[in-house]
A protein has these predicted regions:
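Short amphipathic alpha-helices and their capping/turn segments at secondary-structure boundaries
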Residues: 42-56, 157-166
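A short, gly/pro- and small-residue-rich
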Residues: 183-193
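An acidic, phosphate/nucleotide-engaging active-site surface
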Residues: 110-185
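N-terminal amphipathic/basic leader segments beginning at the initiator methionine
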Residues: 1-39
Length: 193
């Protein structure tokens, strides 16, 4: 049987009498106009106000995005995260938002290499944000960049990335369709301690 493993495939033998193959459903049809679909989602989100109405001059905007830790095949460029972030940045610029940071939501995963960040974000975004220090990777063990936001009923301290806590708006670019990924838990695992 052929398995996806890391960046490659491996061929493995499985015992026929103790193995069962479960096939996934057919893939979803591709989106013909990804940029249009992204823009439509930002202008017409489910159960939320359109992004442009939330953007105000002088605000702190933080855009978090998935790291490269999941063993999924690399996307062709442009990566969907790049497309999402470009659309958000365009709307932010139109609204006069200048204080924008990009954070790779690593949680406790390994740091991404610069070439991985460039693959995810594209050269233009990387070159615009990385040299200024406004593109960085969350470090759940860097306590100087964490802030306490409360504690659980059991007394466990809740810490989150300081920039995220201080932001007026946080946008998260998540692109995976796997059962254990995405949604609010991307924040609680990606940019918390």
């Amino acid at each position: 049987m052929l398995f996806w493993r890391g960046e490659n495939f491996s061929l493995e033998r499985l015992p026929a009498d103790r193995s069962r193959v479960i096939y996934p459903p057919e893939p979803l049809a591709g989106i013909e106009d990804p940029e249009g679909a992204i823009r439509n989602a930002l202008l017409n989100p489910m159960d939320a106000d359109p992004l442009p109405t939330l953007l105000k001059p002088g605000m702190k905007l933080t855009i978090c995005f998935d790291d490269a830790s999941l063993s999924l095949p690399k996307m062709r460029r442009p990566d969907t995260r790049q497309r999402i972030i470009e659309a958000v940045l365009e709307m932010a610029a139109e609204a006069g938002v200048d204080d924008v940071h990009l954070i790779a939501a690593l949680g406790l995963h390994r740091r991404m290499h610069d070439y991985e960040l460039k693959h995810v974000l594209g050269d233009r975004i990387f070159d615009a944000f990385h040299p200024r220090g406004t593109l960085y990777q969350h470090d759940a063990e860097d306590y100087d960049n964490l802030t306490v936001i409360g504690e659980t009923e059991e007394g466990e301290v809740l810490e989150i990335n300081k920039r995220v806590a201080e932001s007026d708006l946080v946008v998260y670019a998540n692109v995976n369709q796997v059962a254990m990924d995405g949604g609010w838990k991307s924040i609680t695992t990606g940019v918390a301690s």
